[in-house]
Amino acid sequence: MNLAIIAGDGIGPEVIGEAVKVLDAVLPEVEKTTYDLGARRYHATGEILPDSVLEELKVHDAILLGAIGDPSVPSGVLERGLLLRIRFALDHHINLRPAKLYSGVTGPLAGNPEIDFVVVREGTEGPYTGTGGAIRVGTPHEVATEVSLNTAFGVRRVVEDAFRRAQQRRKHLTLVHKNNVLTFAGALWWRTVQEVGAEYPDVEIAYQHVDSAMIHIVTDPGRFDVIVTDNLFGDIVTDLAAAVCGGIGLAASGNIDATRTNPSMFEPVHGSAPDIAGQGIADPTAAIMSVALLLAHVGETDAAARVDKAVEAHLSSRGDQELGTAAVGDRIVGLL
C-alpha cells in the first residue's frame, strides 16, 4: 500500500505519529509519503494545496489526515482550500462515520446502552455545493437562498454503498430525511432507497424524519444499523452519534470514493486543538481508529480487526488513568 500522510495543524502531527506507529506494527510494508499542508505552509508560501501536490495525492492508495485549522489563519481558508478541495477533486461522495460505544467508555446515556451503527452520509451534494446567493444585501429587503442539490446519480451511488454495508452487518437500513417538508429531494431519496432495496431483499428498510431520528439516537440507539442520509442531515446526525459514544475524541471518519478511482481519506473527527498542541496530552485514539477504517477500506481486513480489537482492549481496561499521547500509542501497540 502507498499511503499519503497529511499531519496538518495543532495536535495533528502528534496523533498521526501514534496512528502511524500502530499502522507500522500491523502492516510494516506500507510505503508512506508525508505532505506538509496546513497553516505552516500557508504562512511560509501562501500556498494551501498546489495543483502539483493534488496530482501527487491522486496516485496513492489512501490518505491519512490529522487535523486542519489554526487561529492564525482566517476561519474557512484552510478548510475550503484544502479539505473541501480534496473532497471534490477526489470525488469523496461518501462520508463514513461509525458510531460504537466501546466497553469501558462512559457515554452520556443512562445505562450505557449498546450502540453500534454506521452513518453513510452523502458528501458532495446537498446544500454544501455553494449553489445560492443573495440580493439587496444589508437592506431590509435582503433575500438569501441556499439551494440543496440532489442528483439521481449522486443519491444512488451513496444508497448503493449503504446497502452493501447493511448486507455485511445486521441487514437493516434506515433512510433519514425530512420528506414531509423537503418533498422533491425527499421523494428522490426515498424512491432510490426502494429501488436499490429491491436488489437486497434480505435488508430491512426503514424511514425516519431527521428530528425523530435524533430523538431515537438518544432514547433507542440500538434500533439503528446503517443510516443513510444527505449531506446536511448527515453533518448533524454524525455529531450526535459521536456524542452518545463518548465524544468526538473517540470518533473516526472516512471520506470515500466508493468507485475506488481516487484514494479515500481517513481522519479523526476532532479538530486541531491548538491550545494543547505540543504538550503530549492529546488522545490519539480517534486517529488510530481511523487507521482501522483505512485498513478495512483497502482490503486489509485482518489488520483492521486487530487494530479495532486492540483499541477496544485499551478502552475497556484503561480505567481512570491519564495517559499521554505516546503512552496511548504504545499501549495499543502492546495490545495488538
From Swiss-Prot:
Q: Which cofactor does it need?
A: Mg(2+); Mn(2+)
GO terms under biological process: L-leucine biosynthetic process
A Pfam family recorded for this sequence: Iso_dh
Q: Which SUPFAM superfamilies match?
A: Isocitrate/Isopropylmalate dehydrogenase-like (SSF53659)
- UniProt enzyme class: oxidoreductase
Instruction: Report if keyword Amino-acid biosynthesis is assigned.
Output: yes
The UniProt entry, under SMART domains, shows: Iso_dh (SM01329)
Marked site positions, Important for catalysis:
Y128, K178
Q: Where in the cell is it found?
A: Cytoplasm
Q: Which superkingdom, per the lineage?
A: Bacteria
What residues does substrate bind to?
A: R87, R97, R121, D211
Q: What is its EC number?
A: 1.1.1.85
Q: What residues does NAD(+) bind to? A: G271, S272, A273, P274, D275, I276, A277, G278, Q279, G280, I281, A282, D283
Report residues binding Mg(2+).
D211, D235, D239
Copy out the cofactor comment: Binds 1 Mg(2+) or Mn(2+) ion per subunit.
Keywords for this protein: Amino-acid biosynthesis, Branched-chain amino acid biosynthesis, Cytoplasm, Leucine biosynthesis, Magnesium, Manganese, Metal-binding, NAD, Oxidoreductase
What are the GO MF terms of this UniProt record? 3-isopropylmalate dehydrogenase activity; magnesium ion binding; NAD binding
The main location is cytoplasm
Pathway where it operates: Amino-acid biosynthesis; L-leucine biosynthesis; L-leucine from 3-methyl-2-oxobutanoate: step 3/4
Instruction: Write out the GO cellular component annotations.
Output: cytoplasm
Q: Which reactions appear under catalytic activity for this entry?
A: (2R,3S)-3-isopropylmalate + NAD(+) = 4-methyl-2-oxopentanoate + CO2 + NADH
State whether it acts alone or in a complex, and with which partners, per the record: Homodimer.
Any idea what job this protein has? Catalyzes the oxidation of 3-carboxy-2-hydroxy-4-methylpentanoate (3-isopropylmalate) to 3-carboxy-4-methyl-2-oxopentanoate. The product decarboxylates to 4-methyl-2 oxopentanoate.
**Protein name listed in UniProt:** 3-isopropylmalate dehydrogenase
Q: Which gene encodes it?
A: leuB
